[in-house]
Amino acid sequence: MKTEKLIYRLRKIIAYICDMLFNQIIGQEHIKNHLLASAKNGRIPHAQLFIGKEGSGTLPIAIAYAQFLLSHFSDNPEASELKVGKLQHPDLHFAFPVTTNDSVKKHPVSNLFLSEWRDFVKNQPYGSLFNWLQSIGVENKQGMIGVDEALEVVKKLQLKSYEGGFKVMIIWMAEKMNTAAANKLLKLIEEPPEKTIFLLITENEDQIINTIRSRCQALHFPVLSEQDIAMSLVARENSSESEALKIATQAEGNYNKAVHLLHQDSNDLIFEEWFITWIRAAFKAKGNAAVIQDLVVWSETIAKSGRETQKQFLAYCLQFFRQALLLNYKSPELVFLEIKTPKFNLQNFAPFVHSENILAIEKELNDALYHIERNGNAKIILLDLSMKLTRFLHKKEKTI
């Protein structure tokens, strides 16, 4: 009889928990069902790697999954649920990229930013690394998970569970873990204490060292559907249905991008200004040594903005060129870019982006992203890119 009552109680707890945080997540039904089913069946890998692009919901799902694990084995599931909802459960731990700022002058670790982290997750659960660094006032720096953080993780997980159940460590943007930190955590991830669960979240699994990756069970998240994004914009952001559908087609499966498009993120206006200044100078630079100085000044300006901003800008440039290509090849229904700069007409620019130069342009932009990500000299990288762009834009398309 006691066993039957226990089973009945557990089923009620599971139903209650499943109806809470998981139902706030956009789409990803297959992922949610897989995680819940494996947990109910007692198949809970001790180290899991959630792999998904920005805005796909990896962090919200990791938190919801942690909530399920922690509340499922609690004597008071409602209280446990509430604590996880506030990100204040004593058995839920976080590690994420940080760096020094005005408040934290040295040895930055996640614990010193927990208040800001809770606000960030509450307000931007689908937010990017760039958004996070903006929120702590360091968008001009690169966040990192360093060896000090790794030591903190080890220290936290050596302690017994406060509530006698699981301990969950969520490592967000795990690709930002440097080699020293990864090596410190290697043995712990391979052989964690009993009832300790690691949830590593990444947008780029190739940047995580293989010895860490091989010790985790990988779970790949697809991008969100346009329908899921549109429905969520209507429900969460009070968007009209027509506007939500338009933005959903632009968002490329990224809910974070959709929200910023809806609210017309001011970064895009700055990026548009930088891009058009760059393009105009690149057009004039061929055979005009005086204009080369304009490209040097432009490169210096962007180089001062910080690496995360530079990476965001280069991604914006990729999108701009692709939109121009679509317009050039008579697919205006796929073009969503709305230019705010006076006297710049995308229709007039589009013919300069074509089959003979688009692959080279994309390659050089991606190469620049790669080198900036790896701490290359931004001024030199951007100036080199500018010189190449000057050649590409003057390349003629072959006529048949």
Features from the language model and the residues they span:
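Residues immediately C-terminal
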Residues: 176, 191, 207
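Conserved catalytic/switch belt of AAA+ P-loop NTPases
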Residues: 158, 183-194
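Charged, glycine-rich active-site and insertion segments that engage polyanionic ligands
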Residues: 21-86, 194-197, 203-316, 320-400
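Short, positively charged and aromatic/hydrophobic N-terminal segments
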Residues: 5, 9-16
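Loop/turn-to-beta-strand initiation segments
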Residues: 163-168, 193-199
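Clamp-loader machinery-focused feature within the broader ASCE/P-loop NTPase space
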Residues: 15-176, 180
